[in-house]
Amino acid sequence: MSHEKSFLVSGDSYPPQNIVGPQAPMPPYVQAPYPGAPYPQAPFQPSPYGQPGYPHGPSPYPQGGYPQGPYPQGGYPQGPYPQSPFPPNPYGQPPPFQDPGSPQHGNYQEEGPPSYYDNQDFPAVNWDKNIRQAFIRKVFLVLTLQLSVTLSTVAIFTFVGEVKGFVRENVWTYYVSYAIFFISLIVLSCCGDFRRKHPWNLVALSILTVSLSYMVGMIASFYNTEAVIMAVGITTAVCFTVVIFSMQTRYDFTSCMGVLLVSVVVLFIFAILCIFIRNRILEIVYASLGALLFTCFLAVDTQLLLGNKQLSLSPEEYVFAALNLYTDIINIFLYILTIIGRAKE
């Protein structure tokens, strides 16, 4: 009894024909035209890349353009919204996909992750502002004490006859107080470490205030009471106006520091001229220029105190700031007193 094989044996040309189930379609068998002839080859397809060493035959399909459609070809019509041009990709790659909800959608492009150091600027700004405000309050407190001492000394030397007579008879006390004032002024102006060292800076400032108050009171004792009172009132009005104006204006007076220093040299030469030429009109002109110059210095020193312009003082220099404002106000008072006194003669 013979059994037909139902599996493929190595060396067989064709699979068995009695396999159970549907059989896969077989390709048509190509017969040779005559015994011994080779099997016909399929037509050669030309290589699209034109490789050398392979024969190139004619393509079985006619080459040519696509037929023209019934609609005219052209660009797409412009939409109702203007389209923003995109720069071409230099490498011919398609543009990356952008999520409409991402922060880089549209023309906005974020360079990097948000910096948390930016949020720390606000406490620093508030901290600097608080320090500057405390510095301003301290300076005006010291200045108020200085002016109170000077005003009290001027009032005593003006309204008390015994004191007025004593200082008029003892002129040498003026030169002693001037020497003490000059030494303390040089120390506070030139020695930065000393004027920042507490409490010696306040001690030196107190010595300067007392000596200058004595000088101002002695000068005021040579004028009548009415002239002194008028000078005090005018000085108060001028200084208050200049300080308020310096706080509100946008003009930077600190940029004029060089011009003011040159003006001080010119005023000093003018003062030497007035010593040798005793003329009432010339002295009034000199006093007017001096009052105007130190009014400008008061504006500059006020803006240096505020710290909102090109130049500013360090919060550690509250003694130096008070010294500048105090000497400006005293010089304005003395020049105005000279103008009023010479005008009444």
Curated annotation (Swiss-Prot):
TM spans (from-to): 139-159, 171-191, 202-222, 227-247, 257-277, 281-301, 320-340
Protein name in the entry: Protein lifeguard 1
Secreted recorded as keyword: no
Family, per entry: Belongs to the BI1 family. LFG subfamily.
Region annotation Disordered: where it falls in the sequence: 1-115
GO cellular component, one term: endoplasmic reticulum
Record localization: Membrane
GO terms for biological process, alphabetical: endoplasmic reticulum calcium ion homeostasis; negative regulation of endoplasmic reticulum stress-induced intrinsic apoptotic signaling pathway
Function, as annotated: Potential apoptotic regulator.
Subcellular location, principal: membrane
Record-level Gene Ontology MF annotations: transmembrane transporter binding
Compositional bias segments (type: Pro residues): 24-46, 79-98
Classification via InterPro entries: Bax_inhibitor_1-related
PANTHER family in alphabetical order: BAX INHIBITOR-RELATED, PROTEIN LIFEGUARD 1
